[in-house]
Structures are given as C-alpha cells and as structure tokens.
C-alpha cells in the first residue's frame, strides 16, 4: 500500500494523499496559474522541491539557514486585541503593548500601527489620536513601524459614503453614472489617504502600508496608485508598501488606466511594474486560496504566480501570506503545518524578498512565519535588512550584502542570534532584552542611522523638537 502524507484542503481540513496524487495536484495547480496569467510553468526540479517540502515529516518546517527574509504585517495589533469573531484573540492591551510584543516577544522585523476600523476613511475623525499613538510607539520602539490600513473604496458608496453604489447603478443600466461614481470615490480615496498619512508621517511614522489594494476593483487600485504617487512626491523618504487584495484586479469600471496600462484584469506579474512606477518601495502580491482544492494544488498555483511577480518586479516583493492567500488555508487559526510549508516554498522556490504576514491568530501567523522564514528582528539583524529594503528599494540579496558589509560580518550571520547579540550591544543599536544603560527607542535608531547611512523619520522628528 502506498504511503499517504497528511496535508490540508484549502479550508484547513486534514486530508491524506499519496505521492502520486500530490504530484498530480501540484501539476494541476501550477498549470492553472500558467494558463490564467500566461506565465511559464515551474521547472521539473521546482515541482519536485515543492513535493519534498509538502512531504517533510515534521509538523513544522523552515527555510535553509541563510535564506531567511524580513517580514512585514497587515492588521497590526488587531490579531492581539481584536475580538470580532475572526482572528483576533481579544487580549485587553494597548496598541503600544501590542506593537512592542511583536518587536520583543515575536521577533518581528517590522511592525505596523492600525486603527480598530482598519481603513483610511474612518481614521479621519480620530487622526489626532492615531498620531499620538504613533509618537509614543516610535519613542519606545526600534524596528520600522508603519501605519497600515485598507484603502477600502467601498466605504465611499452609499449607505456609508457620499456616492451612489455603482452596483445598484449598473443593475439599473446607468453605466455612465456608475463610472462617474467610481471615479469620484477613487479621487476621495486618494485625497483621504494622503491627508491621513501627511499627519502620521509628521508624527514619526516610518511609512505606510496599503493593505488589500483593489478590493473594490480597478477604481480602488487607481485611487491607491495615485495616492502612492502623491505621497512619494511629497515625502521622498517615506517607506511605502502596497499589498493587493486579490490575484486579479476586478474590472468594476473597466476603462481606467495608469501609465497607459488598463488596470482591469491585471495579474500579479503585471501589477508589479505599476506599483513600482507609482513609487512604492515594496510590492505585496497575492494569490487567492481555493477552499475546495488541496494544499498542493493551491501552493503550486501560488508559487508559480509569485515567482513570475518577483521576476517582473524592480522592487522587493513581500508576498501576502495571511489566511486564504499564498497557499495558506482559509481558517482563522491557520494550521501551522500548512503555514510553515507555504512560507518555506515561497522563499526557496518563488524567491520572494519577504513575507507580509496577514490575518490569522498570533501563533498561526506571525509566530509560525517568523519561525519558518523570518530574520527574527532585533534578536538578530532583521530590522536592519528591512530598513534597507524600504530605504533603498533593495531586493533581499542586495540588502543582506549591504548590511553585512556595514556590520563586517557574513550574510549568514545576519540571522544568527549569537553573533548579533554581542554586536548589537557593542554598536548600541538596540537589543531585544532589557539591558540597563543600552540605547533604546530614538537613541538606538539614531545609531542605526549612522551605521546604515540612512535617515529615519522618527529621528528627524526628534531632532526638530530639540532646541
């Protein structure tokens, strides 16, 4: 009797497959991506490598030593203090505590602050509160800290917003009116996002994370691209990450273009050049999980799409890897076996420059991804490598080589806690454990500025405030 391996369905249910069935599913998932995106197939060796990862006997797996990548985040601290019946675990805690827990306890390379109603539009009435939270976090933290939210253009339509719902207009065959409504909403999305981030950047934010770009279709992406363009023009040093909502941009409008390219129907490898053109530092491509398909099918499909996106992108790619995307099952508590296998495959086969950790409980998301493929933040040098990716648009190899040269170590040492512990204390660039007298917060970041030859926004704010 053939050996069967414990794997998952796209909804997280455990299944058992033989090696022959796994290979069949891998080929089918890969072919689906190749057909839809008109991209090359994975090589035979890559399919074999995927199968090897899936059939590894351990519950958790990880990347080979030296292949670790930085992680970024969606939903911020909501996975800790959120309690809305999804993936938040409802721990009563401040956002400062949540951010520092990711930095100090989870070993995150970067973190983000976000509002409980995680979209830019609802932030407007409480932006002063968000600015104060950002200032306090920046005074206490060392890793790059973004402000993150969803463009969420749907909030600009009735009954939540001022513009008539284009879906209702199209049902009434009022096509021109529907187009007008989407264009007006996109303009407001751009305006609001820029306004919010002007305030947050003035309060020390390292940058902005656009989470689930194009969730409301091509007009949503249109508004977001113009927001990125405006922010880059006004703030040349702002860190900007643009993560997508889905693998294909829905053509709700159908006629909108950016840089002469029609947005409707774009796949990840076609989205990447436009995100870079607008001025983002990091692109977060997405591949949706099909809950009725197996994990081999979903993972091969996702890896194929992401490999093409990485090759087409001139900026680093941090693949979105929350529940329901990136080959990960659609489950609030993502199975650790599936998460770590997907994380390893994305780094070793797709060649991604980082992982954008998405929705899921703390153990299933940040802890699993960081254990599988992360650089462990301040425990080693993950925060430094992440800063170079965002400061200079460096892909993973270049960023690691740059930081290693500055530290006078080998690139493999950048994820070595033993090497980096002593070095961080010696250079006074912040250590993860509490050491009396060691530089913390702004002081540590000022030393990082000198070490890496970069400017850090919260340090600039501090310098302006001193007399």
UniProtKB/Swiss-Prot annotation:
Record pathway: One-carbon metabolism; methanogenesis from dimethylamine
Gene Ontology terms describing biological process: methanogenesis; methylation
EC number: 2.1.1.249
Pfam families: Dimeth_Pyl
GO-annotated molecular function: dimethylamine methyltransferase activity
Key word Transferase present: yes
Matches recorded under InterPro entries: Dimeth_MeTrfase_MtbB
Keywords of the record: Methanogenesis, Methyltransferase, Pyrrolysine, Transferase
Catalyzed chemical reaction(s): Co(I)-[dimethylamine-specific corrinoid protein] + dimethylamine + H(+) = methyl-Co(III)-[dimethylamine-specific corrinoid protein] + methylamine
Family: Belongs to the dimethylamine methyltransferase family.
Summary of the function given for this chain in its UniProt record: Catalyzes the transfer of a methyl group from dimethylamine to the corrinoid cofactor of MtbC.
Protein name, entry field: Dimethylamine methyltransferase MtbB2
């Amino acid at each position: 009797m053939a050996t069967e391996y414990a794997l998952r369905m796209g909804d997280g249910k455990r299944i058992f497959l033989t090696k022959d069935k796994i290979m069949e599913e891998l080929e089918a998932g890969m072919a689906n991506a190749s057909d839809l995106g008109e991209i090359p197939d994975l090589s035979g060796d890559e399919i074999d490598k995927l199968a090897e990862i899936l059939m590894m006997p351990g519950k958790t797996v990880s990347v080979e030593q030296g292949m670790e990548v930085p992680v970024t985040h969606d939903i911020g601290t909501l996975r800790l203090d959120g309690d809305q019946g999804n993936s938040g675990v409802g721990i009563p805690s401040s956002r400062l505590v949540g951010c520092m827990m990711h930095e100090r306890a989870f070993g995150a390379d970067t973190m983000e602050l976000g509002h409980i109603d995680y979209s830019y539009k609802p932030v407007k009435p409480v932006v002063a509160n968000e600015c104060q939270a950002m200032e306090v976090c920046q005074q206490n933290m060392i890793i790059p800290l973004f402000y993150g939210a969803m463009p969420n253009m749907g909030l600009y339509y009735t009954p939540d917003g001022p513009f008539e719902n284009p879906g209702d207009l199209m049902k009434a065959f009022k096509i021109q009116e529907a187009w007008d409504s989407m264009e007006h909403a996109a303009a407001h999305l751009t305006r609001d996002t820029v306004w919010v981030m002007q305030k947050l950047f003035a309060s020390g934010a390292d940058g902005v994370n656009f989470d689930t770009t194009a969730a409301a279709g091509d007009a949503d992406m249109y508004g977001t691209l113009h927001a990125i363009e405006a922010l880059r023009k006004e703030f040349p040093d702002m860190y900007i990450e643009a993560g997508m909502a889905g693998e294909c941009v829905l053509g709700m409008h159908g006629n909108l273009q950016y840089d002469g390219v029609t947005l409707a129907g774009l796949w990840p490898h076609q989205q990447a050049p436009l995100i870079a053109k607008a001025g983002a530092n990091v692109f977060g491509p997405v591949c949706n999980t099909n809950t009725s398909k197996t994990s081999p099918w979903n993972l091969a499909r996702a890896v194929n799409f992401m490999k093409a996106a990485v090759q087409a992108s001139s900026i680093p790619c941090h693949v979105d890897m929350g529940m329901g995307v990136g080959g990960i099952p659609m489950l609030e508590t993502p199975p650790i076996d599936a998460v770590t296998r997907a994380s390893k495959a994305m780094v070793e086969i797709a060649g991604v420059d980082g992982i954008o950790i998405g929705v899921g409980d703390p153990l299933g998301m940040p802890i699993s991804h960081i254990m599988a493929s992360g650089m462990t933040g301040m425990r080693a040098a993950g925060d430094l490598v992440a800063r170079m990716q965002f400061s200079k648009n460096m892909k993973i190899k270049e960023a690691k080589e740059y930081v290693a040269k500055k530290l006078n170590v080998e690139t493999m040492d950048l994820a070595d806690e033993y090497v980096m512990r002593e070095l961080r204390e010696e250079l006074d660039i912040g250590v993860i454990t509490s050491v009396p007298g060691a530089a913390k917060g702004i002081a540590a970041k000022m030393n990082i500025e000198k070490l890496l030859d970069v400017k850090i926004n919260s340090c600039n704010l501090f310098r302006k405030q001193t007399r």
